[in-house]
């Protein structure tokens, strides 16, 4: 009986281990999902929902965050509730202006495609979103916020630029800078971790981008390796501004529960008001991952990972310099009022000894040679994109002209909900 019981336990352990590995692989593939999708997936797992820790942290049995959980159903938006950002230029753009060549990314509401403008012969990354999917999850506010932030980003070298936007009856189109050096996530997967000088360079460019957003009273809220791109020379480009919060002044706070699980700051998990320092926590988490290969409090068990973020002391292995250790301890301070950046925001980060070798004027002017060159041969070089995306066929509907779309009641509702989305740069802009 003892031998049989032991054998049964061994079999169970092996099976469970295989399951955990499969879950981890799937989880890593789905890190690109927003927190909404991630939590909905957890909530649909009966086994996970039984854990008191999961119920406590996510409050699954008593949803109180309609913006996160979509717990309170509401009727379709009436005309008075429709989003209207005011007058904007009409670019007269349409899908048939482009050759859509390859899928280079995917998200909750659509795809990102490499496209060539037929008249200009210029390559762009075109983010195409399904209006009905956005409306179904009540995410119009975040999409419009992303558009607003993109309009402010055009003057900063480490933030992706919006060239113009337009819409059809059923889709939204963001025409963005095409960046083909790969996601930081992709390079971390291949190399596991970076040497400290390389991590310092990336952290400095990321901090510069975050500092610029903060100067515009914008909190980014979703810094992670998947949202950090490398351009063709190896410089950082921050992208995906859907979770940005606008109008947060120096001492201002917000309380929406959002972000990506591995990078959530303690105050966000506690559902307390939080401020700009949430971005400095995320910078610390990304820097830690660049140096060590995993986020600082990572666990395969989500509830355990959240408990680690809230309660576990930061553990730093000895293979980094004292200045890197000091910076990580300052950024990953659980008390946001004591966190590095709490007093003087970006200026505190900029003046830290870890960055003493960085000439910030040269950095912002891209006069510092990046430590890694993606060595892309041109716009059609897709070696740094996941084949999972690039091998997917381009949907024919993406390039379809508006006249060919059947305008149903739901399509009309979707079209009206995004009045003011279209944008064209002024004639005297850099474009």
Swiss-Prot record:
ATP binds at residues 104-112, 127. Residues 1-60 are annotated as: Necessary for localization to the mitochondria. Its EC number is 2.7.11.1. Two specific sites, one in the kinase domain (Thr-256) and the other in the C-terminal regulatory region (Ser-422), need to be phosphorylated for its full activation. Phosphorylation at Ser-397 and Ser-401 are also essential for its activity. Activated by WNK1, WNK2, WNK3 and WNK4; which promote phosphorylation by mTORC2. Keywords: Apoptosis, ATP-binding, Cell membrane, Cytoplasm, Disulfide bond, Endoplasmic reticulum, Kinase, Membrane, Mitochondrion, Nucleotide-binding, Nucleus, Phosphoprotein, Serine/threonine-protein kinase, Stress response, Transferase, Ubl conjugation. Residues 81-91 have a biased composition (Polar residues). Belongs to the protein kinase superfamily. AGC Ser/Thr protein kinase family. Serine/threonine-protein kinase which is involved in the regulation of a wide variety of ion channels, membrane transporters, cellular enzymes, transcription factors, neuronal excitability, cell growth, proliferation, survival, migration and apoptosis. Plays an important role in cellular stress response. This is Serine/threonine-protein kinase Sgk1. It comes from Mus musculus (Mouse).
